[in-house]
Amino acid sequence: MLRLGWFSTGRGWGSRGLLSVVADAIQRGELDAEIAFVFCNREPGEHSGSDEYMTLVQSYDIPLVTHSSQRFRKEQGAPNLASVREAYDREVMALLAELTTDLNVLAGYGLIFGAEMAQKHVSLNLHPATPDGPIGTWQQVIWELIENRASESGTIIHIATEDLDRGPPASYVSFPIHGQGFDDLWAAVAGKDIDALKEKHGEELPLLQYIRAEGLRRERPLLLETLKVFASGRLSIADRLVVDSDGTPTSPICLNDEVERTLAQAGGSD
């Protein structure tokens, strides 16, 4: 059985959905795993979204560990968390010292692991791009796709490192961003300057929103299918590298078929 740790800020429905799809699969016997703990860098009463998230965690009877990064920063008199990240990470590691795991998941975790934390708690992270795609926030990624008139987008699951979005990849899903549903949206931005589009529309640009939505609906099944691969022993992590069942470093697994099958069975909804 795969023993998982779970890190999340728990800001909204996306974080709740990622936890639920995995916890529900465990309860159904579909995923041979258990969630040993959920860590949240907020505390009860700090944010309504996080409070909802903590209630969800408790409904699954999963041990919940909290330590407010905002309160820690203020207590340290630091201008930002980055300047005291390693000290914060050490306190988190102390809180989790007795909770051993095989693998951890960053699912809506708003902080970046420092080097020591990344080594101590080997974790998987989601990034909204294909393995050879852009890095950065989801907004930066999609704007770059639009600017380059890219043919596809996707989501990758990789090992979290202190080098943001550059950890060794484990799995991915990709999907076309031209064709049905997309072509009219591309036509609406044809020949227009990317900076002008950002200034006028920002995140409300229909093409940007549609690419984002298609990526989001694939995140949950991608995470679940990836954890199934790890639970089966097909993949594992050794020396912070993704390796196959023989212990050989391997390329990321494409899970397009599994993800699209899940979406089709759900009637295209998540």
What does each of the following model-derived ranges do?
Residues 1-270:
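One-carbon transfer enzymes
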